[in-house]
């Protein structure tokens, strides 16, 4: 296993442990090859990508774009990219999603916050 792959596996495992400690039931799926469905499963309606890169900007960009394809493959409504911060606890990492997907999440969680039903995302 390459050094970078081992680093990613450690982060994914630590993230699963953290999410489970918060009451979720998540796990790392077997690698799916060309039909990637994300790094972590078990959060209903979500595809999850996890990045532990030195280049945080690149991790945000590539991971957030990548989770959109994983979302399609999984048939998930939402996608989130968890990005590790160096020398910080897992809980202090970033959870990144596209703004249009965030609006979809808000519509589901807080429908009363929207003025009417005509506020479709572009």
Tell where the protein language model's regions lie, with residue ranges.
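Catalytic phosphate/metal-binding cores of nucleic-acid and nucleotide-processing enzymes, i.e., regions
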Residues: 1-122
């Amino acid at each position: 296993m390459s050094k970078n792959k081992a680093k990613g596996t450690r982060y994914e495992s630590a993230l699963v442990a953290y999410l489970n400690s918060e009451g979720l039931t998540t796990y790392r799926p077997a690698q799916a090859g060309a039909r990637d469905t994300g790094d972590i499963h078990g959060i209903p309606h979500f595809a999850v990508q996890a990045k532990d890169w030195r280049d945080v900007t690149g991790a945000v960009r590539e991971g957030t774009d990548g989770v959109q394809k994983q979302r399609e493959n999984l048939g998930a409504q939402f996608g989130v990219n968890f990005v590790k911060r160096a020398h910080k606890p897992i809980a202090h990492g970033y959870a990144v999603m596209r703004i249009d997907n965030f609006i979809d999440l808000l519509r589901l969680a807080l429908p009363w916050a929207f003025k009417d039903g005509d506020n479709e995302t572009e």
